[in-house]
Amino acid sequence: MRVLAAMSGGVDSAVAAARAVDAGHEVVGVHMALNRSPGTLRTGSRGCCTIEDALDARRAADLLGIPFYVWDLSEDFVEDVVADFVAEYAAGRTPNPCVRCNERIKFAALLDKGIALGFDAVATGHYARVVTGPDGRAELHRAADAAKDQSYVLAVLDADQVAHAMFPLGDAPTKAEVRAEAERRGLPVASKPDSHDICFIPDGDTRGFLADKLGEVPGEVVDESGEVLGTHTGTYGYTVGQRKGLGISRPAADGRPRYVLSIEPVRRTVTVGPAERLSVGALEAVEAVWNADAPVGPVEVHVQVRAHGEPVPAVAELTGPADDPVLRVRLRTPLSGVAPGQTVAVYRGTRVLGSATISGTTPLS
């Protein structure tokens, strides 16, 4: 099998490429140049997609003895990930750029280009598993290492994308074992730290990044009765469930902390309230993508709304017209701080069935 190994310059993608080579595949390494921002076009910068990362990926490919290329996908990335990120925050929603990158870059732009060049699959360093089901179709499952499982950010893949995906680290028992394997192989990135930042915001200042893009859009911070508690310079600086940096000029009368309950960018208001008002008993989601058969009628599933969140039992049902359905989810266990724009991933056991983008929630009380 001809395999295109996406090599980010980190330890996971390097070991994944090595395992693909060991499996007897014809492997070609490719590093995606995604970002041209000044913060990433220097060595030693944080995040990923830096020049240093490209050099590390090349060193790993050289050690493995595989061809290596750098593909410039920066225009796709800016349009499909960065611009989308800014637009979503401007609309009062909370996007996950890693989900969008997997959907539109790694398993769309990269995969499409790879297939056009005669490759059969794209291999990445994600912690997830592709399993052949009883019907012969490829199924997406959680990784063996629950602590590192990344199936949530891959839940946006459709059935064809899953069929062309390869995750060689899916059966790795722990990340420590992956690092130990990299050390045994002599890979130069064996001890390289993991990246935890949004790659196009290497300093971690999301609010500052958005302010540069959107400018000041002043408004009010209010309680549920509409009483003004403070002011803000842009609703994009807030997300549902946020506690710190609210811009409240005085404490609540009961002395309890306040959290962001909702964001209304048109009215330029941020509504805050007590923690119990964050509890959600149901949610609605749109733009569903299924890599399994779409659920028919109410079905018992588990859902997850954050990359490292706990899955909770729920009843899911598709409603509305077939060409534009709404996924309605009734939670068996309430969740807290669920924001529009987040991805809800749907599971049956360890299998990922699909995902959708949360458009609204129903408070528990």
From Swiss-Prot:
Q: What is this protein called?
A: tRNA-specific 2-thiouridylase MnmA
**Keywords of this protein's UniProt record, alphabetized?**
ATP-binding, Cytoplasm, Disulfide bond, Nucleotide-binding, RNA-binding, Transferase, tRNA processing, tRNA-binding
The family database entries (Pfam families) matched by this protein are listed as: tRNA_Me_trans, tRNA_Me_trans_C, tRNA_Me_trans_M
Question: Keyword Isomerase, does the record have it?
Answer: no
Which catalytic reaction applies to this protein? S-sulfanyl-L-cysteinyl-[protein] + uridine(34) in tRNA + AH2 + ATP = 2-thiouridine(34) in tRNA + L-cysteinyl-[protein] + A + AMP + diphosphate + H(+)
Q: Where is this site: Interaction with tRNA?
A: H126, Q342
User: What organism is this sequence from?
Assistant: Kineococcus radiotolerans (strain ATCC BAA-149 / DSM 14245 / SRS30216)
GO MF terms, alphabetically ordered: ATP binding; tRNA binding; tRNA-uridine 2-sulfurtransferase activity
Q: Family per UniProt?
A: Belongs to the MnmA/TRMU family.
Q: Which domain of life is it from?
A: Bacteria
Looking at the record, which segments are called Interaction with tRNA? 148-150
Per UniProt, where does ATP bind?
Answer: A6, M7, S8, G9, G10, V11, D12, S13, M32, G125
Query: Which SUPFAM superfamilies does the UniProt entry name for this protein?
Result: Adenine nucleotide alpha hydrolases-like (SSF52402)
GO-annotated biological processes = tRNA wobble position uridine thiolation
Q: Where is the protein situated, by its record's location annotation?
A: Cytoplasm
